Amino acid sequence: MEAQGVAEGAGPGAASGVPHPAALAPAAAPTLAPASVAAAASQFTLLVMQPCAGQDEAAAPGGSVGAGKPVRYLCEGAGDGEEEAGEDEADLLDTSDPPGGGESAASLEDLEDEETHSGGEGSSGGARRRGSGGGSMSKTCTYEGCSETTSQVAKQRKPWMCKKHRNKMYKDKYKKKKSDQALNCGGTASTGSAGNVKLEESADNILSIVKQRTGSFGDRPARPTLLEQVLNQKRLSLLRSPEVVQFLQKQQQLLNQQVLEQRQQQFPGTSM
């Protein structure tokens, strides 16, 4: 393509009267023909290697103003051709869709339309729900004697109870459950060991009495109080008094005589 542009660019230069080295070759001497051919070849090679170079750079190897004009035309033509080729390629890229590409683009657009439509329906449905929720009837507490009302109920069909009475109901159920468990446990224990309960109670009473008198098992006896100590001292002093001693001796003698009389009655032949 660039070589053809060079050939076409050389045409106008020849028409304008500027002599070309290739045109002068037949009129010149045979010795000058190789030099002119070499100069033309060098000019062509430079134009091919540097198609978009400036006017001065392209005219420097040729050394003439007439040779610079086709170079300018060649650069401009090459630039325009490249731009047109780039536009054609862009058009080809834009128009050359893969098979089914149009369908995919259309399907994407349809999906977007469906999403927007569904979003609109969802928003309208949410608005309807909010409207229905806002217009819901208020409910009253089902506990007897309570007049508390509310409009914030999750399930309209179920009965509603205020927090205070709901907690009270839960507590009552818990207490009832515990009492039932205690009664069941007590009933089974009483039916299984009715006789053992009495024995345990009597044993507990005896143990409590013994502990009160002597303290706990394994320990020393409980220390008597001050009143008990005073009473014990008075008893000892009375027992040691002479009157009490004489009285006790007389009583002992009487007992001994009674015992002897009983023995004589049982065994009349015996004598002490």
UniProtKB/Swiss-Prot annotation:
A Pfam entry, by short name: RFXA_RFXANK_bdg
Region: Disordered, residue numbers: 1-20, 74-142, 175-195
Motif (Nuclear localization signal): 163-178
Organism of this sequence: Homo sapiens (Human)
UniProtKB keywords: Disease variant, DNA-binding, Isopeptide bond, Nucleus, Phosphoprotein, SCID, Ubl conjugation
Record's keyword annotation contains DNA-binding: yes
UniProt crosslink position (Glycyl lysine isopeptide (Lys-Gly) (interchain with G-Cter in SUMO2)): K198
Cell compartments where the protein resides: Nucleus
Tissue: Ubiquitous.
Protein's GO biological process: positive regulation of MHC class II biosynthetic process; positive regulation of transcription by RNA polymerase II; regulation of transcription by RNA polymerase II
Disorder this protein is connected to according to its UniProt record: MHC class II deficiency 4: An autosomal recessive disorder characterized by immunodeficiency, failure to thrive, and recurrent bacterial, viral, fungal and parasitic infections from birth, usually affecting the respiratory and gastrointestinal tract. Patients may die in infancy or early childhood.
GO cellular component, one term: nucleus
Free-text note on domains in this protein's UniProt record: The C-terminal domain is necessary for the RFX complex formation.
Entry-linked InterPro entries: RFXAP_C_sf, RFXAP_RFXANK-bd
Post-translational modifications: Phosphorylated.
Protein encoded by which gene: RFXAP
Renumbered residue ranges of the record's region C-terminal domain: 214-270
Entry protein name: Regulatory factor X-associated protein
Acidic residues compositional bias, start-end: 79-94
Main location: nucleus
One MF annotation (Gene Ontology) recorded for this entry: DNA binding
Cited function: Part of the RFX complex that binds to the X-box of MHC II promoters.
Quaternary structure (record): The RFX heterotetrameric complex consists of 2 molecules of RFX5 and one each of RFXAP and RFX-B/RFXANK; with each subunit representing a separate complementation group. RFX forms cooperative DNA binding complexes with X2BP and CBF/NF-Y. RFX associates with CIITA to form an active transcriptional complex.
